[in-house]
Amino acid sequence: ATCFDPAGLTGWGVRPTIHSRTPVRGAPMTILSRFAAALFVVALPVFLVSANVRFLASDAGYYQHGFREFDSSGRSGLPLADLDRAAQAIIDYFEDDATTLRILVTVDGQEASLYSAKETGHMRDVKSLMRVVYRANEVSLAIVLAYVACVVLWTGERSIAGLARLSLAGVGCGVAVVGIIGVFALTGFDQAWTTFHEIAFRNDLWRLDPETDRLIQMFPEPFWEEATLIVGGLTLVQAVLVVALSVGYLVFTRAGRGEG
């Protein structure tokens, strides 16, 4: 068919072709979206595990329970009141800017340092490790919240159902890692605990003598075995909750579409 072009741009007998298409996201945006999704999948289990470690490390009640459960007073020769006070000092030490942990106790009527130079050196290393855990906890929480707020709620680029699927992937990865660690811990915690120290610390300050070093007298290996099981148990319970909510939402929405 012919048409008249008032602007004289196409001439007689030629109808201008107008292409209509849906905008397609560019490759950079697709890569960014996938990267953000991968960050969310990694950040979710990191947040769960680090939050539970942080919770237990900051719980004076658990320290006090451990002192009584594993006879820390009998091992160290110190009254429970001093041990409980030391527990709070350790919790504060993990949070404050002090370089050296200094706790004074009364021994044979004289004031003395609770820990030796070797023990305070190890606690300095422990504090550095705990700072990494705390920062990982905060950064992973920020990633999870930012992903939900920006990608799901604000831009709508990913649906709630998509978020549920990513959550399942995240907790799946987390449960797999926790499960592997749990198997090693249950089949031989002593070796697993030693391997952890060899990986986490670059020196031998952690090799303490239970006959003379109060740090290991206060916190014997069974204390850490129980703490590891508690962190693993809490993480698994939270993972089950995330799975239940995610699967429940996916099933509910699918059933709703079927009825529609």
Residue ranges: model-predicted function:
Residues 26-62:
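Hydrophobic secretory-pathway targeting helix
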Residues 30-31, 141-187, 241-260:
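Juxtamembrane interface at the cytosolic side of transmembrane helices
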Residues 55-93:
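Juxtamembrane non-transmembrane segments of integral membrane proteins
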Residues 96-140, 221-235:
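Individual transmembrane alpha-helix segments
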Residues 186-211:
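Juxtamembrane non-transmembrane "cap" segments at the membrane-aqueous interface
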Residues 204-258:
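Terminal transmembrane helical module of multi-pass membrane proteins
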